[in-house]
């Protein structure tokens, strides 16, 4: 059974960063419960396929060189874990956020993604 740090890694790198649909599918089977809920600023999506679809939509909308990079250490509780990330060309992110996972029976049952607000001049 994977631990919280492994689930954080898998969610970010093996699902949301993975451009190969078959490898993403295999990772999602290992990482998420069947009824996983993914909640981000665009809405709430339920089920492994819905998570895979959101990952594909994200990757389809950016340049091939964009990557997710961890942006700090993982934070781990008894049934929750969190990881900050940055996204964009390596070393030059265009977005930052944090994934907060709820873990049930060794798999992720909820992914809450918070995205930093765009910086604006005041």
Each language-model region and where it sits:
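Residue-level detector of alpha-helix boundaries and kinks
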Residues: 12-13, 36, 40, 86
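Domain-scale activation on soluble regions of proteins
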Residues: 2-5, 45, 52, 108
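A beta-strand edge to alpha-helix "cap/lid" segment located at domain peripheries
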Residues: 3, 59-122
